[in-house]
């Protein structure tokens, strides 16, 4: 606790009191040092890069449903690419209209739930990461992996969906307003990403210019051909590990006791 007090902190207040009065109250109630060290928050923790395709399996005989995750290293985040990230996420994993749900659940009934998207880091320049997921029956794991991997390797193209994607993104951006009490946090978060104006102003402009070729180019540079880590959790007695190994190579088994402490 003593070390924490030696670092700068950020306090957000929403209310009717004047700023100076709020400051005096905080200084009287909190142990705030005058000479503090600069904070490095949010800290970007080092991550082991994904350099080759790998499959990990965490056995759990109690699981009624198997869970399969797909991980791909992304690129350093830049706000100029914000709409491209949003558009790909919507096209590839955007709910029931996205490729993942449509190809895996609607067409083939292989999954209870499925998604795939790039996550945005809190600061510009930090790394993005793609996370895909399929929740399916244990006896359908291999088939579900086959379909998902084919989507990542050779994404189906439906250019006619672009107008609907533009409409969804435009509505999302324009309706994503901070509440009264969260305005200052939103402003700080936007500044951390590198924005100097309201992101919606830039994003609406880029959405209007968005074409399907933008989504395709993003996929080709951020997803296609990149090494993939697959993590499977499920009942080892119901998942055909021999067939999985024959098709995808070595499977590294994980242990709950080593991953999680009691």
What are these regions (language model features)?
Residues 4, 48-51, 61-63, 105-109, ...:
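A generic structural signal for short, non-catalytic loop/turn and secondary-structure boundary residues
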